[in-house]
């Protein structure tokens, strides 16, 4: 009886131990399986978010940083601008990441741009960069500047002096309100004379430009400091359009990121960069007229 009882007890203990080990193995396997499922789900979610973000950037809206003052004071250096990608349809040059692949010619879902639109495009003479200018001349137009006044098809546009603009650097500009034939109104700027001397006055008087079919004529709002269709830019093909600029979402007087200055200098630069934020420009509509 004793032996049988001992054997029975030993068997029970062994069975319990085996059951516990099996339970541990099952739980461990189940946990690893759940972890793998969780990791897979996290990766799927991450990839989905990235794909959605890329599609938004490619097809709907994209952020652009303006590095120069050719559109001053409508747009200043280091303004961050949102541009809508769908405004004029799509081309190889407007589809981000695909501009090096020639998928098709021309534009799909094309919409006609209007005079006065502020457009981001690839300049024909510098295709690896982006310009931002104001559209003035449409295909078939004759455009000419006489004494700084724009003539479109021999009709003088309305141009009214509207005071003085002083830049952040302290430079003075003459400010003019211009109205295009379609009724769009905006401000243009010309360097104020110093001791009676005008700057770059040769760009205020030009030959007549005849805009070819499928191409457009652009000017910068900062008339004396803009490389536009009067100078090296020339006419811009419709295919080169990237986006229509809409509004400023952020702006600073200085840039912060510079890969050449090192981490410590970036940290030291953070405070002056934050202090240079132009709060009065955040969410500014580029087509609103503010005197």
Swiss-Prot record:
GO cellular component, one term: plasma membrane
Periplasmic side: 67-291
First-tier enzyme category under EC: hydrolase
Gene3D superfamilies for this protein: Umud Fragment, subunit A (2.10.109.10)
Cytoplasmic-facing ranges: 1-45
Domain of life: Bacteria
Gene Ontology biological-process entries: signal peptide processing
Family annotation (CDD domains): S26_SPase_I (cd06530)
Membrane topology reported for the UniProt record: Single-pass type II membrane protein
Record InterPro entries: LexA/Signal_pep-like_sf, Pept_S26A_signal_pept_1, Pept_S26A_signal_pept_1_CS, Pept_S26A_signal_pept_1_Lys-AS, Peptidase_S26
EC id: 3.4.21.89
Sample GO molecular function, one term: serine-type endopeptidase activity
Presence of keyword Membrane: yes
Residues at the active site: 70, 133
Protein localization: Cell inner membrane
The keyword Membrane belongs to this UniProt entry's keyword annotation: yes
UniProt KW keywords: Cell inner membrane, Cell membrane, Hydrolase, Membrane, Transmembrane, Transmembrane helix
Pfam families: Peptidase_S26
Transmembrane annotation, as ranges: 46-66
Catalytic activity of the protein: Cleavage of hydrophobic, N-terminal signal or leader sequences from secreted and periplasmic proteins
Similarity field: Belongs to the peptidase S26 family.
NCBIfam families from the UniProt entry: sigpep_I_bact
PANTHER family: CHLOROPLAST PROCESSING PEPTIDASE (PTHR43390:SF1), SIGNAL PEPTIDASE I (PTHR43390)
Protein name listed in UniProt: Signal peptidase I
Species the sequence originates in: Rickettsia bellii (strain RML369-C)
The organism's taxonomic lineage, starting at the top: Bacteria, Pseudomonadati, Pseudomonadota, Alphaproteobacteria, Rickettsiales
């Amino acid at each position: 009886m004793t032996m049988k009882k001992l054997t029975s007890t030993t068997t029970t203990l062994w069975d319990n131990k085996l059951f516990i080990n099996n339970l541990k193995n099952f739980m461990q396997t189940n946990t690893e399986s759940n972890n793998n499922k969780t990791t897979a789900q996290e990766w799927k979610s991450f990839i989905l978010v990235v794909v959605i973000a890329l599609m938004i950037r490619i097809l709907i809206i994209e952020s652009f940083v303006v590095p120069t003052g050719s559109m001053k004071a409508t747009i200043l250096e280091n303004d961050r601008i949102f541009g809508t990608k769908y405004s004029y349809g799509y081309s190889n040059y407007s589809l981000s990441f695909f501009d090096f692949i020639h998928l098709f010619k021309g534009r799909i879902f094309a919409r006609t741009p209007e005079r006065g639109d502020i457009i981001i495009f690839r300049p024909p003479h510098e295709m690896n960069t982006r310009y931002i200018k104001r559209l003035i001349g449409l295909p078939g137009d004759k455009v000419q500047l006489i004494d700084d006044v724009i003539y479109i098809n021999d009709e003088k546009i309305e141009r009214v002096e509207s005071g003085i603009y002083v830049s952040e650097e302290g430079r003075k500009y003459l400010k003019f309100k211009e109205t295009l034939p379609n009724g769009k109104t905006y401000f243009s700027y010309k360097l104020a004379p110093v001791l009676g001397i005008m700057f770059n006055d040769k760009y205020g008087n030009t030959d007549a430009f005849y805009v070819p079919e499928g191409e457009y004529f652009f000017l910068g709002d900062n008339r004396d400091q803009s490389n536009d269709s009067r100078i090296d830019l020339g006419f811009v093909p419709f295919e080169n359009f990237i986006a229509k600029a809409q509004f400023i979402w952020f702006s600073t007087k200085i840039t912060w990121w510079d890969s050449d200055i090192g981490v410590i200098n970036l940290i030291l630069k953070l405070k002056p960069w934050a202090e240079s934020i132009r709060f009065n420009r955040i969410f500014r509509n580029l087509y609103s007229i503010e005197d």
